[in-house]
């Protein structure tokens, strides 16, 4: 490894260490705030909600990062990359829409299951409506990863962690359980805003060429990464 590459690697590792440390500290503070303002029952409800949203998010992008990044790196031509991007985005977009419909259609039942009450069903409807933002943000993050913009990725993680922590703290103190639920539900929108800011001067937007670039060859290859 050359001196230049070694220097870059050390910088990336240092930034990553700082980001992990900051996220760890923010996590500890966040847990303490939630425990004080929500109590044991509120923390249990938030844990249930996190599990619920994690399941839907995992289904929405299952195999995305592995498949997209692998194919993107293997294909150097811009036109091929546009086809890969459009094909993956359309496929996972359809999966996300199905997940969104399920979340919205059974919101009352989910609310009863998670919170032992259906009075929070509107938050689960909101989650379903905003789920596509999560999928889109995951695509942009995968695109940064595929382009090996590791420093930008680490900076994005750091900034988004601070932003979400600030909103979580404010709304949890101000509105207790409803505030904490709201931020958990809309956190992906905040993350998307941060991601778009980091990508504002990036060539990533060259890959947005609508549905005309969908290639069924890549759609078939996606199934290999779903297992």
Report each predicted region and the residues it spans.
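Signature of the first transmembrane helix
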Residues: 8-66, 96-100, 104, 161-165, ...
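Interhelical loop/hinge segments that connect adjacent transmembrane helices in multipass membrane
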Residues: 1-9, 195-227
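Residue-level recognition of transmembrane alpha-helices
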Residues: 16, 20, 47-50, 92, ...
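Helix-loop junctions and terminal segments of transmembrane helices
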Residues: 31-32, 60-76, 145-146, 203-204
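Membrane-embedded alpha-helical segments of multi-pass transporters/permeases
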Residues: 28, 32, 59-62, 100-108, ...
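Hydrophobic alpha-helical transmembrane segments
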Residues: 121, 125, 154-203, 221
């Amino acid at each position: 490894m050359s001196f230049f590459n070694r220097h870059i690697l050390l910088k990336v590792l240092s930034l990553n260490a700082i980001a992990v440390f900051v996220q760890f500290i923010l996590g500890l503070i966040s847990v303490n705030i939630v425990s004080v303002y929500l109590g044991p029952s509120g923390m249990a409800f938030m844990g249930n909600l996190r599990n619920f949203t994690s399941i839907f998010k995992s289904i929405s992008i299952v195999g995305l990062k592995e498949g997209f990044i692998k194919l993107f790196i293997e294909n150097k031509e811009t036109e091929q990359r546009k086809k890969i991007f459009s094909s993956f985005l359309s496929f996972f977009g359809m999966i996300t829409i199905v997940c969104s419909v399920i979340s919205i259609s059974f919101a009352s039942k989910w609310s009863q299951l998670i919170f032992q009450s259906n009075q929070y069903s509107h938050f689960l409807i909101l989650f379903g409506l905003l789920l596509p933002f999560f999928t889109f943000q995951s695509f942009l993050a995968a695109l940064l990863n595929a382009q090996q913009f590791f420093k930008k990725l680490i900076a994005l993680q750091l900034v988004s962690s601070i932003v979400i922590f600030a909103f979580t703290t404010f709304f949890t103190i101000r509105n207790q359980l409803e505030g904490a639920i709201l931020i958990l539900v809309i956190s992906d929108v905040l993350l998307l805003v941060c991601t778009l800011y980091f990508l504002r001067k990036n060539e990533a937007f060259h890959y947005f060429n609508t549905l005309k670039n969908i290639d069924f060859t890549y759609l078939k290859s996606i199934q290999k990464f779903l297992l």
